Amino acid sequence: MVEDHKHEESILEKIVEKIHGHGDSSSLSDSDDDKKSTSSSSSSFKSKIYRLFGREKPVHKVLGGGKPADIFLWRNKKVSGGVLGAVTASWVLFELFEYHLLAFLCHFAIFALAALFLWSNACTFIHKSTPHIPEVHIPEDPILQLVSGLRIEINRGLTLLRNIASGKDVKKFILVIAGLWVLSIIGSCYNFLTLFYTATVLLFTIPVLYEKYEDKVDAYGEKAMREIKKQYAVLDEKVLRKVISKIPRGALNKKKD
């Protein structure tokens, strides 16, 4: 009797363990399913986040990556500060002090050559070794890469202007005309050096600030784009469609052909 009782107890214990084990596994599977659902929902939420100008890559990749992007995003503060300081000093020298570029280059070359010439001759009198002047060569590959990149961007710009001039996209036409008009106003107020310095300062400040406050800027950008689309829809309905409707259909068919 005792053995039968123990046997029954062991059977009951095994049954209870199986029930608990099944419950634990089911709870684990439920938790895994919950994690998967939350991760999928979070990933879908992230994919729905609005990015300025339809950007899908990080700011570092948008700027081209590598060392130039590191400089613009202040990854190395000493290098970025040195470049911005040199550009600022050049602008102050040429713009505020009204020093001309050709005169500056000539005076700098005169000073450097005279200093090296006197130093080399002085070393012979005091019986010291002459200063080592390193050989400077411009490498070919970076120049070719720069020219190739400029060629690609210029061709893209020419293709865009050609498509706009063909009359296929009214929206791009209006945006380009407005942009050129704004640039003409800015260019009439400032010279090329000031514009270059302003663009450099903006390039060293806007990307790093945007990277820091990316979510807030994208939220405001989304609201602004919605408002712009609303205003463009009103303009398209009240003005553009009326203008296009007044154009003879024969002229439109010729443009399409």
UniProtKB/Swiss-Prot annotation:
It is found in: Endoplasmic reticulum membrane. Residues 19-42 are annotated as: Disordered. Keywords: Endoplasmic reticulum, Membrane, Transmembrane, Transmembrane helix. Residues 68-257 form the Reticulon domain. It comes from the Eukaryota. Pfam families: Reticulon (PF02453). The chain crosses the membrane at residues 78-98, 99-119, 173-193. The keyword GTP-binding does not apply. GO terms for cellular component: cytoplasmic side of endoplasmic reticulum membrane; endoplasmic reticulum; endoplasmic reticulum membrane; endoplasmic reticulum tubular network; plasma membrane; plasmodesma. The keyword Membrane applies. PROSITE patterns: RETICULON. Interacts with VirB2. PANTHER family: RETICULON, RETICULON-LIKE PROTEIN. Plays a role in the Agrobacterium-mediated plant transformation via its interaction with VirB2, the major component of the T-pilus. This is Reticulon-like protein B4. The lineage of its organism: Eukaryota, Viridiplantae, Streptophyta, Embryophyta, Tracheophyta.
